[in-house]
């Protein structure tokens, strides 16, 4: 669940992106798991789903290897784009602002640390 006010808009990085509607201070919590807003799905359940659902999870969800689950949010966080110099850091359970973030700035993370399965480092986004 994104803990900051945000909107989904056109991104110069790729497709749509998540943009902050408020100033965010360096170190501020920006994302945390919420069982109300986020869904954690065991891979065994996903493998029973149609291919288009598997593709959606591979492209937009975070894979949690230690638990064998995928996490996908319902608040638009799945539109968050990759950056080699992200403004969010990730400790595996939470995301924090890596630096001060201005109103209107796109929120970005490093897909290689949040484990987006279809991330292509050569393209800089999931495909």
Enumerate the language-model features and the residues they cover.
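Conserved catalytic SET/PR domain of SAM-dependent protein methyltransferases, capturing the structural core
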Residues: 1-127
């Amino acid at each position: 669940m994104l803990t900051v006010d945000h909107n989904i808009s056109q991104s110069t990085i790729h497709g749509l992106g998540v943009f902050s509607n408020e100033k965010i201070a360096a170190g501020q919590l920006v994302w945390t798991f919420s069982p109300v807003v986020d869904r954690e799905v065991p891979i065994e359940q996903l493998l029973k789903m149609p291919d288009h659902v598997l593709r959606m999870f591979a492209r937009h969800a975070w894979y949690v290897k230690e638990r064998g689950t995928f996490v996908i949010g319902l608040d638009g966080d799945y539109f968050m784009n990759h950056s080699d110099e992200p403004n969010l850091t990730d400790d595996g359970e939470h995301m924090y602002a890596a630096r001060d973030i201005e109103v209107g700035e796109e929120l970005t993370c490093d897909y290689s640390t949040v484990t987006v399965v279809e991330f292509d480092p050569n393209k800089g986004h999931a495909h």
